[in-house]
Amino acid sequence: MNISRRRLLQSGAFVAAAPALNAAGLNVVTLAQAQAAPEWRHALSLFGDIKYPADFKRFDYVNPDAPKGGIARQISIGTFDNFNLAVAGVKGTIAPAVGLIYETLMARSQDEATTQYGLLAESVSHPDDHSWVIYRLRKDAKWNDGKPVTPEDVLFSMESLKKYSPMYSSYYKHVVKAEKVGPHDIKFTFDAPGNRELPTIVGELTVLPKHWWEGKDSEGRKRDIGATTLEKPLGSGPYAIRDFVAGRSVTLERVKNYWGANAPTRIGQNNFDEMRFEFFRDTTVSLEAFKADQADWIIESSAKSWATAYDFPAVTEKRVVLEEFPINDSGRMQGFAFNIRRELFADKRVRRAFNYAFDFEEMNKQLFYGQYKRINSYFEGTELASSGVPVQREFDILKEVYGDIPPEVIAKPYENPVGGDPEKVRENRRQSTRLLKEAGYEVRDQKLVDKNGKQVSVEFLIDSPPSERIVLFYKPSLERLGIEVTVRTVDTAQYQNRLRSFDYDIVTEVWGQSLSPGNEQRDFWGTEAADVPGSRNTVGIKNPVVDKLIDKIIFAKDRETLVAATKALDRVLLWHYYVVPQFTYGFSRYARWDRFSHAPLPKYGRSGLPSLWWYDKEKADKIGKRS
């Protein structure tokens, strides 16, 4: 999967049942016993060629002579109370800075869609049927306390992450055995052959230091990897936590004598001596902090702010640069997600009625300055998005999983209702009323009631002011149908707790999608994940056809089949109206103080911040000292 799957998955936690691995008491066998003559590879690619040869020195898109030094200050919205990655999404709120502390077995190339090269691992081997994979660790890979990274660390990481993290438990559910098969070699055996993606996703395993987690803290207490912690963790990565203020800030410093400084996948990257993460409760305060030069860059998610809030003197004086970076590495679905565990939303007609009530076109004009487009796919922005009617391979796949394909799935393309003018809005309202009546609801005294005469009521659960603006625009349309609508804004901790326990009617959800989807689809839409606390199956989907299509994606033997199966899944999800699709932009918006530089950015790297940039002293001197 491109876009680093970890980045997508760590946006939330999800789970499915999986057998636990036991790293204790493993028998060490010889490599010859594990595989008579393994073919060792320096890279993995799901589909397509590998660009860089085994002896490559660096990625083409980095500046190998980038100066090291300087400070980079960035903004995070929300708070944190945890540095333990193993319980992210289950307990506490993880600090985003933790991602720069640890490393994975492989590292993604940002100028290829689906290719990984060795990081902690120097080479990898797997058979043609992808039934197992062996990773060979670099002999010079070290933790930042000087101890070597070992197979025992890798086994401990797999076991711990599967045990304590719903995200990893589901993600690695097909890994049924992990064993040390040589001084530097770890073999992972899978539950079935044919899953091309499994060697790659094992390569994305975050490796944790066993000796540190099994040791004691500064007060003599045994560490617990199953609990949250604010003890500064040991990593193998280019940065370490220097200091922090709980919930407010984290400062990282570049590790002196970092083992991987000259590794091909690291040269020209991680150039800042210090990186500071400042946490703000909301975007209004964070923008003011940026304007006051208390942060070096800000990612702007608000169309209104992008259109109206960046006219302060530093912009007109060109001391602050506004840039948009294309999002080529992923697709997305963002929408109002129904909790179909609730009786009201178990009926597809009700869900569809809510979609008819959403006037995106008017919202786009009034709130977003016409910047957005409506999302029409769960894989929006990629070749994986369904369109038209299913043909050829996609049709055949739908026939295989359905038997008799429902007419609506094949008769016409999925289309969202279009509003924007009074006549269209009135027609959409009539359609909503018709669907609700078919579902057994009727209007009495301007209230939509069920068969017992109880008014239909829904609560939108949100955790940010920008989300509140959107819901408040949508709210009157639902109220005109006779629905009682409550908007509940809570803090991040409450929001996460209610998500984990499925205590909501409707939430805004975002599912990031890679260019090569696979096992994570089970966690997004699969039956096994539907009722497990912490699942990313926010909707609660339990659909045998969806499960079959996910398997078609996972076990696709070629790119053509994967694309066709993904389009089929997209089509089925759309026609079940599990969400009210919202909107997308296709670019990331950044404002930054002009004290940094970068080489030409790779196609799949977005902004490249912070890893590909460096502090430019000449530019910094021109715009003056920081506040």
PLM segments and residue spans:
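N-terminal lobe/hinge region of extracytoplasmic solute-binding protein
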Residues: 36-129, 159, 234
